[in-house]
């Protein structure tokens, strides 16, 4: 499932947004910023980095930038006014489409769903480079054991942490610290059969 959606997103970024369809030589968008759920952020950021896109921390878009969001509010409106591309993606699991007016944005799930399930573009750069860029100089604070770990979501380096653990053959449980209180961590680790414990990253 994960590989299918990573491929769909990578195909969309390259074939729909970064393609020079008319051979004009004009600059194509290669910058993206998101306000999504952690699991959605992970997929978008890993796919974008693998295709050479820049992940923006700023909320000041330029024409041609891509903004993917769960909320169509003033931020999305400002991005559209600037000339950025805006995709609306529902926050709920198992959603198939955006439920409500799009107000100039595009339905993110509908756009992605039309893409092939396998890469139809040139092989992306090695994921090692994408991982290292996403980790921004951080590393696990202690040796990691087990086959399944938990990570506290960090908006800046979370996607890199997930990719780092995936590349070492581990499955990952993403915990949003804004939605889960610390006293529930032990229960979550047990319920999710996390044998590698909670992994933290630091410089």
Predicted features, each with a name:
Residues 38, 72-74:
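Short beta->alpha connector loops
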Residues 94-130:
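Serine hydrolase/lipase
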Residues 43-48, 75-83, 160-165, 184-189:
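Short, aromatic/basic amphipathic alpha-helical patches
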Residues 1-19, 118-146, 150-153:
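Conserved AMP-binding/adenylate-forming core of the ANL superfamily
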Residues 74-108:
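A short, gly/pro- and small-residue-rich
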Residues 13-52, 144-167:
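Conserved AMP-binding/adenylate-forming
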Residues 54, 61-71, 132-142, 146-203:
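AMP-binding/adenylate-forming
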């Amino acid at each position: 499932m994960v590989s299918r959606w990573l491929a769909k997103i990578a195909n969309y970024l390259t074939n729909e947004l970064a393609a020079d369809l008319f051979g004009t030589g004009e600059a194509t968008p290669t910058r993206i910023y998101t306000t999504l759920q952690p699991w959605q952020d992970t997929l978008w950021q890993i796919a974008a980095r693998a295709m050479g896109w820049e992940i923006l921390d700023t909320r000041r878009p330029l024409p041609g930038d891509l903004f993917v969001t769960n909320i169509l509010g003033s931020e999305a409106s400002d991005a559209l006014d600037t000339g950025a591309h805006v995709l609306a993606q529902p926050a709920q699991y198992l959603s198939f489409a955006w439920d409500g007016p799009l107000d100039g944005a595009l339905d993110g799930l509908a756009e992605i769903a039309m893409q092939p399930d396998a890469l139809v573009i040139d092989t992306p750069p090695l994921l090692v480079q994408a991982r290292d860029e996403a980790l921004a100089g951080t590393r696990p604070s202690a040796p990691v054991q087990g086959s399944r770990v938990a990570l506290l979501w960090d908006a800046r380096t979370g996607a890199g942490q997930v990719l780092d653990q995936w590349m070492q053959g581990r499955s990952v449980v993403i915990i949003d610290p804004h939605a889960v209180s610390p006293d529930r961590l032990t229960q979550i680790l047990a319920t999710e059969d996390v044998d590698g414990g909670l992994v933290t990253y630091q410089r």
